[in-house]
Amino acid sequence: MAEGGFDPCECICSHEHAMRRLINLLRQSQSYCTDTECLRELPGPSGDSGISITVILMAWMVIAVLLFLLRPPNLRGSSLPGKPSSPHSGQDPPAPPVD
């Protein structure tokens, strides 16, 4: 607690507000649980929401492979036998003329 009896944390989250949230949480859980059983399916988003994270990751992998296979020839770095890999055919470039 701060000096003078003023608590700045109480401006953000008071004890009454915390107790109100706790009571609401207990009331919600009581509507889904009885004395003998608790229902497994609570309200909210269900487990089978259609598309899972695995399907999304597999789709991204397929897109990445397709982009890799369909990249332009200048990014492929191909080394064809009749085509030199560099403009100087593996030799050092000529030295500049000295005047």
Swiss-Prot record:
Keywords noted in UniProt: Endoplasmic reticulum, Membrane, Transmembrane, Transmembrane helix
Membrane topology (UniProt): Single-pass membrane protein
Pfam families in UniProt: DUF2615
Membrane side Cytoplasmic: residue ranges: 71-99
Signal peptide range in chain numbering: none
Spans within the Lumenal topological domain: 1-49
Localization of this protein: Endoplasmic reticulum membrane
Keyword Endoplasmic reticulum in annotation: yes
Entry's Gene Ontology cellular component terms: endoplasmic reticulum; endoplasmic reticulum membrane
Main location: endoplasmic reticulum
One GO process term, biological-process aspect: blastocyst hatching
Annotated stretches, region: Disordered: 77-99
Annotated coiled-coil segments of the chain: none
Protein name: Small integral membrane protein 14
Organism: Rattus norvegicus (Rat)
Lineage: Eukaryota, Metazoa, Chordata, Craniata, Vertebrata
Designated gene of the protein: Smim14
